[in-house]
Curated annotation (Swiss-Prot):
Protein's organism: Leishmania braziliensis
Protein name as catalogued: tRNA (guanine(37)-N(1))-methyltransferase
Function in brief: Specifically methylates the N1 position of guanosine-37 in various cytoplasmic and mitochondrial tRNAs. Methylation is not dependent on the nature of the nucleoside 5' of the target nucleoside. This is the first step in the biosynthesis of wybutosine (yW), a modified base adjacent to the anticodon of tRNAs and required for accurate decoding.
Stretches the record annotates as Disordered: 207-242
Compartment annotation: Mitochondrion matrix; Nucleus; Cytoplasm
Reaction(s) the record says it catalyses: guanosine(37) in tRNA + S-adenosyl-L-methionine = N(1)-methylguanosine(37) in tRNA + S-adenosyl-L-homocysteine + H(+)
Amino acid sequence: MSARPTDASMEPRAVPHSYRKRVHSTVELAALVYQPLEASGALLSILRGKLYHQRNVRSVLDVVAVPTDTGDQGHSAASKVRVEYLAPPSNKANRNSSSNISCALRDDIQRGSRAAATCNSSSPPTPPAFLEGCCKMCLLDPTVLEAAELWPDPTSVTQNSTPVFLLGAGIPGARVTQQLEAALQTGQLPRKAADLLQQLHERLAASPPSVSLTENQDGDPQAQDSLRAVAAPPSPSSRKRGSYVGAVEVTFASRTVELSYRNYTMSELLSMVLPLREDADLVALSGFEQVGHIAHVNLSAAHLPYADVIGQVILDCNETVSVVVNKVDAISSVFREFKMNIIGERRRADDLGGDVGVGANVSDSGEVGDSLTAEEKAVIALEASSLNSPAEARLNRMLTAAVRQHGCCFRVPYNRVYWNSRLSFEHARLVGQMRPGDVLFDVMAGVGPFAVPAAKKGVKVFANDLNPVAAQYMKVNAELNRLPANSFHVFNMDGRHFLNSVLFDSITGAAASKIEATATSHPGCVCTGRRHVTMNLPAVAVEFLDVFQPLSNTSSLAGEQQSNAATAVAVNERWNRLPAHVEPNDIDQGTLFHVYSFSAAEDLIADAVRQVEANLGYTLPPESIEEVLMVRDVAPTKRMMCVSFTLPPAFWANLLASQPGNDGASFTHAETVSALVEEGAEPTIKRAKADALLTRGV
């Protein structure tokens, strides 16, 4: 694996952090400011769908309205007052300071208001000249109202707020309409703003007030007292969310919002920084697979010049990701790992501002506070030995992910083993079929996604993988999940050898291997349930079934034919030569095989069964097929299939006939591999529930 591509012909990559400046912008928004705070439930319910929506931007703010003098001394009229909406003070000292900013100015205006009220005490109360004190500010979506519509002249000194309007229960509708029309005529409000306030008033007034006022009651002192009662906020005991009975003071203001890369989703950022319109071959990145702290993407050739930018965008938008890798080639290694490049890595300090990065407390192994097991320490010590360079050892630790799946913990050396998070549902489905007392033989186990949860469930496990790193980390994961040593056995051998030794000894009771002999002698390791065999290597798993093929009944072959026959016998001889000491009644003929394969045929079910039969050497009768399942889509025309079956009666008859002392030698059953499933016999069909949820691609 390489940390960077070595193709000299590739275009120079953009600087990863440069995209942040390109997406930085400011936006001026219209905002609705109101008092009292008790009206929040009702107002926010009415404004639902009308508020500004942007990632990491609060659309409802707590503000303190502070009136300040515009600089024209000697005047206390409202036209000479500018209202600033500040953040609430963090402590009492700041609160006192902000409340004293314009104490003298506020006293002058209050005296003028009281004098005006005395001269005309019989008229309905007028709204205040400006808001003051604690308020709520709601940022409006530009499609509802733009700041430029409120204040066409951006240099206007009075661009701070509009007149205050009194809305809600107890306020005559005619009076509200009159005030809004006056504001329209004087240019204080645009039509869209007036319509919004009219809608707010009608919705707020729809709640039945404690008293109804009409124009005829304006001169009634008792009605004036009732109006003041309506305008007063309800007591906390009578307050209900979404309902408010009383008057609300409302005005409009502007708010400048700065937008950075933190305010956009990953798809939005990629559409902004990648020239998707200019380059027809450059398509939007659909997503990525996350394994622990590692994000895995499959970039096309058109994406490669922007690989570092794509990696940085993924890091910026996903705090749990600290490394981004790109798959370079298809899986071709016998160990099933794939070549990858690191296109993004979260540093311990941000390169731009020096701030500690999000993943600064994540170690190179991708852990956050988890203690290492003894087995894992041994593996790390081995990797840090002279066999590996320091850079390679660090790379291996950095690409070892900590994954939790279905209640189990896994260490996954992602660059050295095969792991597919999209198979999570399939792991749970198959393990869900097993019961305590069952025995699982996992022929291609990887790091144990089938084996570990099965063992944790009380299933005795024999897990094998040809990849020595996978076998090492299976032991790590067994210790990490505190599995008993006598219930979890790890092997590192070829799959055919595992089938011909460990599985054969267990099914027939031959117990030829020392490990199996020791295990079966333990009372807790006897199979009291069912044996399961999983072969989860869909590209070639069916080919391993050739160990069960019958021997050729041709007695004499010549030249090259004899050589080829000898090779075939070496593969499948074990399952065609039953030892004399084996008791036929002790053979478990109910062992259930779960074999995975790929299919692109129109009839997926029939094709999956044909693949099994062609490599097994026997036709599967309907009673031998328990389930044929489509696991997931791999490509538009390619599916991953699972055939669950038992070995057919013809196989067992052939095996028993091969035991010394029986009449006749091993024979080939009449049902050859060319035969299809009997007419009208259909296997059980069940489509995985996860099929609709899993994305395409390996």
